[in-house]
UniProtKB/Swiss-Prot annotation:
Key words of the record: Cytoplasm, FAD, Flavoprotein, NAD, tRNA processing
Descriptive protein name: tRNA uridine 5-carboxymethylaminomethyl modification enzyme MnmG
Family (UniProt): Belongs to the MnmG family.
Record-listed FAD binding positions: G11, G12, G13, H14, A15, G16, V123, S178, Q367
Gene it is expressed from: mnmG
Subcellular location: Cytoplasm
Transmembrane segments: none
Keyword rRNA processing: no
Molecular-function GO term, any one: flavin adenine dinucleotide binding
Positions bound to NAD(+): 270-284
């Protein structure tokens, strides 16, 4: 039996849901293929959305009318703004989510989307004619003819779970792996690699001694992810905090040989910034303890996720470890932690549209491209789904640049540098992070979404209202001006150069906010709190944007500079251990080569340029 679609999306995880929604919103008749409808939107690992760098991605997805922000707002049970004490450009909105509420909200969003069908079935193979994908073949003989396919396999591509010496072929616990598609990709000539991720044991919250633990509350004023969310209405909860002990560390060291990671059973590389507890003890064993956040998985679910003790140790060792951790001495383990290996495709096999170079019409998104994290997957899914719809319709595909979105930074990093370990988004990866803030994602991307036809009427009305208020506030701030003497009479001391400064320029000063300006011009008192905060943020950053452009231009000017082979990077202050190791091992020949290294950041590149200059000057002095 053959059914006809414009776009077929394979997989109902975070990448697949965004891809299917984006393709359908773009006008493509879309099929989302998954083994079971009730697994759509499942949070496979940690029950949280957002965080540093990741929260920016969620805001960008929302700005293009994607799903993740709205679903997270509906399911969030502990909202916190990370890096609150730092500048707005690096603050990270995050929420812990109720797993059930998140899954159900995502399923409802998929169910309500026009032009989108959910097809339950197992994908066995693709039909490819003259270098172009033409159909998806399902178990049972069903054929889905199509103009484009988005493949979002997550950890299912030849997935293999490890619990100590025990191995289970699975995509995640109790769900079958995808073996046929891995063979399909291999036959097509794709360069495949092996990666690994892990998850901690799940605990019964009723058996945890909460009274003995430190607690962490949600923010009193939760900040939603979505422009479409007026406020958070889901009840907010507290989390518990505990730490590993010296007894924990001794037990882990004594059993390292039984860990799948350290026994040689696992060939895949794990995420550097989400290490297993075994890795933490081996690499940072001199610490007194490692923090563990005890995160309830739902409002009516006693399951607790102990964030910080991901492991592939045997089940009996995991039980003994729990007994050494304060508050968990009598905890019941509902499911053991495990590591999972899976295949991924070298992302350099992709165009920046996320279409593969080998097969026209085939797009990849999510962990198959070597990333880690729900948010990274969702961002890729949105872009891949949009471009798949445009490919099927014969339209021009979209590339997001590094200057306009973190999604663009991520895709450029992946497709130009490749990966040797799972890729995670950080704000430090962006050259233009002062202008790529979480608070202005809508202004950067919603007009583009409207132009592409994927933003709803309701979204555009809400966006128009927000921008109307912001533009009015900007105009008012620029219309009011005062001299240094006038400012001094209001208690503000600035350079007495006789120059009149607008209210907008005055907002760049640390002691000036909209409330201060209201003392000078009462009209400012009518500006609402959200608009005021955004106006203050952009005004304060405006004075640094020219410097940001200059720094980026300087780095580009230095790209041709050669790096002497004798330069030692091991002791360079300010350079991360990751990059010290990579610079020492790979010895890039030039600044341009260093810039293309996986994990390189604009700030790190500036440090390397300065170090090479210093080294060359020192060598000349010696000569």
């Amino acid at each position: 039996m053959t059914d006809h679609y414009d776009v077929v999306v394979v997989g109902g995880g975070h990448a697949g849901c965004e891809a299917a929604s984006a393709a359908a919103r773009a006008g493509a008749k879309t099929a989302l293929v998954t083994l079971r409808f009730d697994t759509i939107g499942v949070m496979s690992c940690n029950p949280a959305i957002g965080g540093l760098g990741k929260g920016h991605l969620v805001r960008e997805i929302d700005a293009m009318d994607g799903l993740m922000g709205r679903v997270a707002d509906a399911a969030g049970i502990q909202f916190r703004l990370l890096n609150r004490r730092k500048g707005p450009a690096v603050r990270g909105p995050r929420t812990q989510a109720d797993r059930k509420l998140y899954r159900l909200a995502m399923q409802e969003a998929i169910r309500q989307q026009n032009d989108l069908d959910v097809v339950e079935g197992e994908v066995l193979d693709f039909e490819i004619n003259e270098g172009r994908i033409t159909a998806v073949l399902l178990a049972g003989g069903r054929r889905l003819a199509c103009g484009a396919v988005v493949l979002t396999t997550g950890t299912f591509l030849r997935g293999l779970i490890h619990i100590g010496e025990k191995k289970i072929v699975a995509g995640r616990m109790n769900e079958q792996a995808s073996l046929g598609l891995s063979a399909t990709m291999d036959r097509a000539g794709f360069k495949l690699g092996r990666l690994k991720t892990g998850t901690p044991p799940r605990l019964d919250g009723k058996t945890i001694d909460w009274a003995s633990l430190e607690s962490q509350a949600a923010d009193e004023d939760p900040v939603p992810f979505s422009l479409m969310s007026d406020r958070i209405t889901t009840p907010q909860i507290e989390c518990g905090i505990t730490r590993t002990t010296s007894a924990t560390h001794e037990l882990i060291r004594a059993n390292l040989g039984r860990s799948a990671m350290y026994s040689g059973s696992i060939e895949g590389v794990g995420p550097r910034y989400c290490p297993s507890i075994e890795d933490k003890i081996v690499k940072f064993g001199d610490r007194d303890g490692h923090q563990i956040f005890l995160e309830p998985e739902g409002l009516d679910d006693d399951t607790v996720y102990p964030n910080g003790i991901s492991t592939s140790l045997p089940q009996d060792v995991q039980l003994e470890i729990l007994k050494t951790i304060p508050g968990l001495e009598r905890a019941t383990m509902l499911q053991p932690g495990y590591a999972i290996e899976y295949d991924h495709v070298d992302p350099r096999e992709l165009h920046q549209t996320l279409e593969t170079k080998r097969i026209a019409g085939l797009f990849l998104a999510g962990q198959i491209n070597g990333t880690t994290g729900y948010e990274e997957a969702a961002g890729q899914g949105l872009l891949a789904g949009l471009n798949a719809a445009r490919r099927a319709a014969g339209g021009e595909q979209i590339v997001l640049s590094r200057t306009e979105a973190y999604i663009g930074v991520m895709v450029d990093d992946l497709t130009s540098r490749g990966i040797s370990e799972p890729y995670r988004m950080f704000t430090s990866r962006a050259e233009f992070r002062l202008s790529l803030r979480a608070d202005n994602a809508d202004e950067r991307l919603t007009p583009l979404a409207a132009k592409l036809g994927i933003a709803s009427v309701q979204r555009m009305q809400r966006y128009g209202d927000v921008m109307q208020r912001l533009d009015a506030a900007r105009e008012l701030a620029r219309s009011v001006a005062m001299t240094p003497n006038e400012a001094a009479r209001q208690g503000l001391e600035i350079n007495r150069d006789g120059v009149r400064r607008s209210g907008y320029e005055l907002l760049a000063y640390p002691d000036v906010d909209v409330a201060w300006l209201a003392r000078v011009e009462p009209k400012f008192a009518a500006i609402d709190a959200k608009t005021a905060e955004r106006l203050e943020t952009e005004a304060k950053y405006s004075v640094y944007l020219d410097r940001q452009k200059s720094d980026v231009a300087q780095i580009r000017h230095e790209e041709s500079r050669l790096i002497p082979e004798t330069v030692d990077f091991a002791g360079v202050p300010g350079l991360s251990n990751e990059l010290k190791q990579k610079m020492q091992a790979r010895r890039p020949r030039s600044i341009a080569d260093a810039q293309r290294m996986e994990g390189m950041t604009p700030a790190a590149l500036a440090i390397i340029v300065a170090h090479v200059r210093h080294y060359e000057n020192a060598q000349r002095d010696v000569a």
